[in-house]
Swiss-Prot record:
Its main location: membrane. It is found in: Membrane. Glycans are attached at residues 29, 109, 173, 194, 198, 234, 244, 275, 302, 320, 331, 367, 375, 405, 414, 420, 457. May be involved in telomere capping. This is Maintenance of telomere capping protein 6. It is a single-pass type I membrane protein. Residues 1-21 form the signal peptide. InterPro entries: Telomere_Capping_Maintenance. Residues 405-425 are annotated as: Disordered. Residues 413-425 have a biased composition (Low complexity). The lineage of its organism: Eukaryota, Fungi, Dikarya, Ascomycota, Saccharomycotina. The chain crosses the membrane at residues 550-570.
Length: 601
C-alpha cells in the first residue's frame, strides 16, 4: 500500500476514533432505565442498608406455573426490569436431609426422570414439582444477569431473601409408613436439592457480599475514622461521617459495587424450621456466607396486618406547628435495619399503596397472584409486575424523568449558558434539564423557572430549610442562597425524602421546589453538583468543542484525499514510458536492417 494511502486511512481512522470514543454511551431508550440509574447514582454514597427497592417472591410464580424450571423463564426479565430482591421459600426435607424448592417430598419408591413434572400431595395440598428444579437454576439466572450488567453504568445490588421452612413429620404410628414412602434407601437414593444452606448460593462466588466482607470493612472503617477525626471534611465525607454514626456500620453502595465489586447479598428473612431431632444444623460456613438477623437485622411486614401502613402514616405526619420531628428521621437513618413489606392475595399492592410503602422506606416484595389464573404462565405474572415498576421509586414521580426537549440543546451545554438558548413562542428561555420536587416526587422542569430551593444541613441529613422569599432559576443558585451550615442539595434516601416533604408541609411551601439534580451536560445522565457537574460516564462534548477537536484531523484528511485525486488524474509512469520507447525503437531498427519485400521463403 502506498504511503499516501496509509496517511489518508490513518487520518480518517483518527476522526472515526474521536467520534466513537466520545459517544461510548449506551442508548437509554427507556424512562425506567434512566430513572433507576439516576436513583442509584444519587444513593451511591449511602449505606446499602438505606437502599429501598422492589422485588418478587418466587412462590407467586411457582403457585401459578408449578415448581418447574420453565416457571423461572421470566426471572431474568424481571431482574432486568427493575426488581432487585428475590424472596425464596426453601424447604428442609427431613426425610432426605436436603434443601429443596418443592414444598412436598418425593416418594422414594418411584424412579424419576429429572425433567418430569410429578404430581405430589403433602399436608392436604397438591403440587406439581420437577425433580430437576433446584436453587442452582435460580442462581444460574442471577449469575447471567450479573455478568450482563457488570459495568459502571448497569451494575446494581441484589438481595436474596430465604424463608426457611420444614417438610416435617411427627413420630407416630404413621412414622414407619411415611419413612418407607419418602426416606431414600440404598437401592433407590433420592438426591434432590442441597445438603447445606451455603451450597444453595455458593455458585454466585465472588459476587456475594458476605458477613466476612462486612466485618473486614467495619474494622477498616474504625481505623479511618480515628485517623480522620478533627480534620476538615468535604460534602462527600460529611455524608459518610453522618451515616457512620449508625448502630451498625455498613459500607456505601458505591463501595460495595465499585470497590468491593460485590453484586448480591443473601439474608434469612424468616426461620420457620420445626425444632426436631432431624432439624437442619447451621454451620460456620452458613454464617460466613449468609446474613442472619444478629448481624444485619431484617424485618418483614405483611400487608394483611396493617402494621406497615400505620407506621408509614406516622412518618408522613412527623411534624407539628413548631417544626419537623428531625430526631425521628435521624434515628431512622442511623438505625441499620432492612425493612420489607410483602403483599398477599387478600391484600395485594395497588399503585398507591406500593408507592406509599416504598416512600416510607420499605422494600416491596410482590407475593400476590394479581388475578393471574393457576393455568396461566409465569410470563403473565411478569407482565402484571411490570405495570407496578414505575411506582416503585421513592424518588421519581411515575413516568419521570421525561424528555421535554425536542430541539438542539447545545446552547445549554455551552459554557456561557445564557446565549443562543431555546425560546418559546413568547420569547421565554426553555431548558427542561433540571429536577424539581413535586407532591408526587421528582420531575423534570424548565431550568429558567424560578422556584424555592431545597437547603440541607451538612451534618444532620434530615434537617432542611426552605426560604419562600428566596426564589431562583436553576442557573442563578449559588452557595450564598442557603443559610450557613446548609447547602443546595437533594434527598439521597427515602428517609431524607420523607423529612424534606414533611418540611414542605410544615412550612406550607408551595411545590415545585428546586433539587440539586440535572442532565444539562449529557442527556439522560442525571448528576448533582450544579449546572456544570460532569456525567461520570462520558466526558462532556459540545458542538463547538467537537468541531475544534476533529478540525485538524479533518483538514489533513481532506488535503490527503485531494493529493490522491490529483495523482490519479495526472499520473505518468516514467519507467513504463521509457520501456515503450525502447522497444518501439528496437523494432524499427530491426525492420530497417531487414527490409524484405513480400513473404520470405
Amino acid at each position: 500500500m502506498k504511503p499516501v494511502y496509509c496517511f489518508s486511512i490513518l487520518a480518517l481512522l483518527q476522526i472515526f476514533t474521536v467520534v466513537v470514543s466520545e459517544s461510548n454511551w449506551p442508548t437509554l431508550n427507556f424512562t425506567l432505565e434512566i430513572a433507576s440509574r439516576a436513583q442509584r447514582d444519587i444513593s451511591k454514597l449511602l449505606p446499602i442498608s438505606q437502599i429501598t427497592t422492589v422485588g418478587i417472591s418466587l412462590s407467586s410464580i411457582f403457585r401459578n406455573s408449578g415448581y418447574t424450571v420453565d416457571a423461572l423463564s421470566p426471572l431474568y426479565d424481571l431482574l432486568n426490569g427493575g426488581n432487585e430482591a428475590i424472596m425464596i421459600d426453601l424447604y428442609w426435607n427431613e426425610f432426605t436431609s436436603q434443601w429443596q424448592l418443592c414444598p412436598a417430598p418425593f416418594p422414594s419408591n418411584t424412579t424419576y426422570n429429572m425433567n418430569d413434572v410429578v404430581d405430589l400431595s403433602w399436608e392436604n395440598n397438591d403440587y406439581q414439582c420437577q425433580p430437576g428444579l433446584s436453587t442452582e437454576n435460580i442462581m444460574g439466572i442471577i449469575n447471567s444477569y450479573i455478568r450482563d450488567t457488570n459495568t459502571n453504568i448497569g451494575a446494581n445490588f441484589l438481595r436474596i431473601l430465604f424463608n426457611l421452612k420444614s417438610i416435617h413429620y411427627e413420630n407416630s404410628n404413621r412414622t414407619i409408613d411415611l419413612q418407607n414412602i419418602y426416606k431414600p434407601s440404598i437401592l433407590n437414593p433420592v438426591n434432590i436439592g442441597n445438603d447445606t444452606l451455603n451450597d444453595t448460593i455458593a455458585s454466585l462466588g465472588s459476587y456475594i457480599f458476605t458477613p466476612t466482607v462486612l466485618s473486614q470493612y467495619q474494622s477498616d472503617a474504625s481505623h479511618v475514622e480515628k485517623a480522620s477525626s478533627g480534620s476538615s471534611i468535604n460534602s462527600t465525607q460529611a455524608i459518610s461521617y453522618f451515616y457512620n454514626q449508625s448502630n451498625i456500620i455498613v459500607p456505601s453502595l458505591d463501595t460495595v459495587l465499585l470497590s468491593e465489586y460485590k453484586r448480591v447479598s443473601a439474608h434469612i428473612s424468616s426461620n420457620e424450621l420445626v425444632n426436631s431431632s432431624r432439624v437442619y444444623q447451621f454451620t460456620s460456613y452458613d454464617t460466613d456466607l449468609i446474613f442472619f438477623n444478629d448481624v444485619v437485622p431484617l424485618v418483614v411486614e405483611n400487608t394483611t396486618t396493617g402494621v406497615a401502613g400505620r407506621y408509614c402514616n406516622e412518618l408522613f405526619n412527623a411534624y407539628n406547628s413548631t417544626g419537623v420531628d428531625i430526631e425521628t428521621f435521624n434515628n431512622l437513618s442511623l438505625t441499620t435495619r432492612l425493612r420489607f413489606i410483602v403483599d398477599s392475595d387478600e391484600n395485594p399492592f395497588t399503585v398507591d399503596t406500593l408507592s406509599k410503602f416504598v416512600r416510607c422506606g420499605y422494600s416491596a416484595i410482590f407475593n400476590g397472584t394479581y388475578d393471574v389464573g393457576v393455568n396461566s404462565s409465569s410470563l403473565d405474572f411478569s407482565d402484571e409486575v411490570d405495570e407496578f415498576i414505575p411506582y416503585g421509586f421513592w424518588s421519581w414521580s411515575p413516568g419521570q424523568p421525561v424528555d421535554l426537549n425536542d430541539t438542539n440543546s447545545d446552547s445549554i451545554n455551552n459554557a456561557s449558558m445564557s446565549s443562543n438558548n431555546t425560546d418559546d413562542s413568547n420569547g421565554n428561555s426553555l431548558a427542561f434539564k433540571c429536577v424539581v420536587l413535586t407532591e408526587t416526587g421528582w420531575s423534570v422542569a424548565n431550568c429558567y423557572d424560578r422556584h424555592v430551593i431545597a437547603c440541607q444541613n451538612s451534618t444532620s441529613r434530615n434537617n432542611w430549610v426552605l426560604q419562600e422569599t428566596n426564589k431562583r432559576n436553576y442557573f442563578e443558585i449559588d452557595k450564598g442562597d442557603c443559610p450557613e451550615g446548609y447547602t443546595f442539595s437533594i434527598p439521597r434516601s427515602s428517609t431524607e425524602m420523607l423529612s424534606l416533604q414533611a418540611t414542605v408541609k410544615q412550612r406550607n411551601v408551595p411545590y415545585p421546589i428546586w433539587l440539586d439534580l440535572n442532565d444539562i451536560t449529557v442527556p439522560n445522565c442525571f448528576v448533582s453538583g450544579g449546572p456544570y457537574a460532569q456525567c461520570p460516564y462520558q466526558r462532556t462534548i459540545t458542538t463547538n468543542k467537537f468541531v475544534r477537536m476533529i478540525a485538524p484531523s479533518f483538514a489533513v484528511g481532506v488535503v490527503v484525499l485531494v493529493l490522491i485525486l490529483i495523482e490519479n488524474i495526472f499520473r505518468t509512469n516514467p519507467i513504463q514510458t521509457n520501456r515503450k520507447r525502447y522497444w518501439k525503437k528496437a523494432i524499427q531498427e530491426y525492420y530497417n536492417k531487414n527490409d524484405f519485400e513480400g513473404v520470405p521463403s
